[in-house]
């Protein structure tokens, strides 16, 4: 639904009301609404109020601490931004998600989280990972500019 929210084709409020009034199991309603409202709004709010939202300096202190503690960890795989863009990793699932994004302009939310976290894992630094994820996201995702999955805005410290 992200592209439809992003371009105003449907309001998140309308979707929330329809879900609330549906016959879906309560746990399904809660899961969808948590993702749509809480995480999405946290990311929007973070980007609105944090002037460095798209830079390493804009991350929360707990994220700085964790990323810096692991900055020099040995990585089994390291890829360039170009290798990421052209789906040239060892991971077939990641490559398929990247290809889907390039072809359809969209990727399922859980895959988008996996996609962004693997870019971090397989990049030489958090700064390069963030820049790569933002550039690929903004180039190929229909909703572009969505930092929900490339920032720490929706993550909790220590999780």
Walk through the language-model features, giving the residues of each.
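Active/binding-pocket-proximal capping segment
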Residues: 52-53, 60-64, 70, 112-140
């Amino acid at each position: 639904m992200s592209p439809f929210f992003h371009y105003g084709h449907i309001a998140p409020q309308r979707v929330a009301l329809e879900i609330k009034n549906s016959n879906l199991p309560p746990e399904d309603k809660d899961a969808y609404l948590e993702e749509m409202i809480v995480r999405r709004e946290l990311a929007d709010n973070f980007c609105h109020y944090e002037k460095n939202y798209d830079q390493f300096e804009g991350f929360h202190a707990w994220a700085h601490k964790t990323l810096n503690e692991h900055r020099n960890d040995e990585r089994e795989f390291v890829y360039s931004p170009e290798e990421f863009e052209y789906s040239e990793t060892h991971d077939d699932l990641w490559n398929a998600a990247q290809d889907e994004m390039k072809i359809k302009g969209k990727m399922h939310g859980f895959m988008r989280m996996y996609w962004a976290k693997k870019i971090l894992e397989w990049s030489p630094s958090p700064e390069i990972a963030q820049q790569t994820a933002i550039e690929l996201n903004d180039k190929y995702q229909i909703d572009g500019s969505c930092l929900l999955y490339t920032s720490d805005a929706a993550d909790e410290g220590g999780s």
